[in-house]
Amino acid sequence: DYTIVVQTSTGPLQLNKITSFKSKQDVTDVRVKRLDGITDHVRFFDGWSGSFDIERQDAAVDRFFAGLEQGYYSGINEQPAQIYETIQEANGAVSQFRYDGVLMTLADAGNRAGDATVKQSINFVASRRILVS
């Protein structure tokens, strides 16, 4: 069982029906070729990125991103968000991770059709993912 909470600078962003959540660690791998012919590798951690899909229930997501865009054109710097990922493990334990320095983009505002729900996609980048518990 997963719970995702998005905390923005203006309060929590209510995402009522999250249908998928995906994240990955971003790294840069640098190859160092030594004079003796052996290749060493140096890894630099470059944060995290991911996406989540939701079923549109109300205008919360649309209003949030409209506010970000309005702020941008008004010269207001975007404040990063946080994502809290809580996992109920199979053995009953609870794991919680926090993504810091999160910037989100509305990758897909959804397709409107007469006989279907509206699926929206949000992409994100984060500075770090920290184990909380």
Residue ranges and their predicted role:
Residues 126-128:
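Residues on the solvent-exposed faces and adjacent turns
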